[in-house]
Amino acid sequence: MSIRRFVRLSLLIIALVSSLCESQKNFACDISAPATAKYGFCNVSLSYEARAKDLVSRLSLKEKVQQLVNKATGVPRLGVPPYEWWSEALHGVSDVGPGVHFNGTVPGATSFPATILTAASFNTSLWLKMGEVVSTEARAMHNVGLAGLTYWSPNVNVFRDPRWGRGQETPGEDPLVVSKYAVNYVKGLQDVHDAGKSRRLKVSSCCKHYTAYDLDNWKGIDRFHFDAKVTKQDLEDTYQTPFKSCVEEGDVSSVMCSYNRVNGIPTCADPNLLRGVIRGQWRLDGYIVSDCDSIQVYFNDIHYTKTREDAVALALKAGLNMNCGDFLGKYTENAVKLKKLNGSDVDEALIYNYIVLMRLGFFDGDPKSLPFGNLGPSDVCSKDHQMLALEAAKQGIVLLENRGDLPLPKTTVKKLAVIGPNANATKVMISNYAGVPCKYTSPIQGLQKYVPEKIVYEPGCKDVKCGDQTLISAAVKAVSEADVTVLVVGLDQTVEAEGLDRVNLTLPGYQEKLVRDVANAAKKTVVLVIMSAGPIDISFAKNLSTIRAVLWVGYPGEAGGDAIAQVIFGDYNPSGRLPETWYPQEFADKVAMTDMNMRPNSTSGFPGRSYRFYTGKPIYKFGYGLSYSSFSTFVLSAPSIIHIKTNPIMNLNKTTSVDISTVNCHDLKIRIVIGVKNHGLRSGSHVVLVFWKPPKCSKSLVGGGVPLTQLVGFERVEVGRSMTEKFTVDFDVCKALSLVDTHGKRKLVTGHHKLVIGSNSDQQIYHHLNVRLAGDSTVAI
């Protein structure tokens, strides 16, 4: 090749690359474009709303409808590039959605544990930090064109039924915990610390799936056809609670409606749920998006409308603003032409969408010149971020049983057998909706750091389903020659997943036989490690004498192996608490997953759901968890009488209930100061759970369905060995001490209330509150 031809070819390549980069700009309002200055939507001195309205006013109907879908086409004539709205960040930046890509520039991102495990930490500051890390990595990837700015996370559905395949994505069964997680993770993702009144967003977060969505595919009944029959009582105090907190306290910028119907109406077509509640009552400042193809689902699968145009009109009029999928893009224009929809309905939806992009800086020019513009590939998978992923896994691990053999001594283990289908897990540990992790540390790799030359490994099963017994004999032989065995069993995405609910609560296939045979062959200590999201009935294992300890490790993320090993060998003192009730198999045998009721029914024999209502005997209770230390708690100060001011003032009545709409709730707060003493020789963290037991008269006053007990506060406290720490728990009385009646109305009940401090794995203490009606809201101590 001649030098001249080489130079020409080089210039052509440079021009092509430059052209490609130009065509792939991930921002609008490029200051180098002459026309930019005349566009009102590029004028940063105007309000977001004014800029969004200006942009929408410049679009034709054909252009408008193509911006109502996740794969927005953009408006090239105005310098607005295409934008992919769908990105995921459930527990790390994920390439599950089309908005994120990994390549040689950014090969992976920090992969935290599944949400169900980080929820077990009961650590609000951890949840906030995780959100901050994820949003930093998202912004860094956006700056190099590998990620969007809108993330459809977190999942804040309550883990209603232990068989649900997507329970792993949630913070558990308790509405307060789910709400606290939602608020903190959303703030971590979205908040810009020096934003002031600008309401800028770091990235946009989305709370999903609204609402009463917690069934995917159980015995042939799928989420696309399921009609969730929910009482007003359960809707108010269980299903809606996390979403309300997410919007009102977390200030989330998006909510996603779900596939299912609620009481006969598809959630994405319900004007009461969307326009009435989210937009009207809760005052969402953001957009409402459908789960992917939800409009198509209610048209094609359940034939909810006669025509596609009717389906589109119904959704937009109900308050939907965006469609994950292409249904709105295909049929909205014709719906307007047929007068089933007004052009103003389309404009309204687009304005809500564009305001979010304005807050993200998408219309402020090159992101490299904006806040977070300095972030790049070196800010993804940083050492600090990977250390936080390890810390999150350690904080969530729950010690279920310990007969004194843990922690294992680091120097006296002569031969360690590592057994089980999840013993060498890698991808299993990062759960679903995960991206490419920075790196993996499997359980066996973590354990090898403590016993580098004395480990023997046998899987015992070909996979988690464990369909045959052929590998069990080799596992038994390995165990018989070892003095300590770590047996890692459980579930994975082939057993519990999106689109796949469990039928049973037992270990799959021959895993139970593997556990029994290993335990019977073991000379000494067996440590049983359970990797799963949903609970498993392991009652049989409690009676096997060689099983000296049991750990639940959820799906522990990229650093799971190190976390497990550090807990087993005592470099970390476990402190996690179960965020879900562990039910016996009997529950799955008797209770239909399609029954949405939370409260028990003695007539039908329905036992109720979650620790708040379940009347059966669980394998392990919500909040259960052991430590290598011994802790005690005590109340240092707390009110004993609460006077409630009502409007109008009501007469004192020892056995009455008051609608909270008549109560001056604004200043009705109480504070409890609690002390925690560590009696052990190890420093550790203690999760203090504060439960509330309503007055005995409550059932008759609110029409039944009163919780057995209810979590009203929690705090994770670090306490040095032989040291004492104190902390405060603040309660909003109207939220914490209220009950929901059968009409869905919140009531305060006067009389004697009991606070229970500690779970059933702790030494519980009690504090009594006397709630009275009065002419003022003074709290007497």
From Swiss-Prot:
GO terms for biological process: xylan catabolic process. Glycans are attached at N43, N103, N123, N342, N424, N504, N543, N601, N653. The keyword Secreted applies. One of its GO terms (cellular component) is extracellular region. Belongs to the glycosyl hydrolase 3 family. InterPro entries: BXL (IPR044993), Fn3-like (IPR026891), Glyco_hydro_3_C (IPR002772), Glyco_hydro_3_C_sf (IPR036881), Glyco_hydro_3_N (IPR001764), Glyco_hydro_3_N_sf (IPR036962), Glycoside_hydrolase_SF (IPR017853), Ig-like_fold (IPR013783). This is Probable beta-D-xylosidase 5.
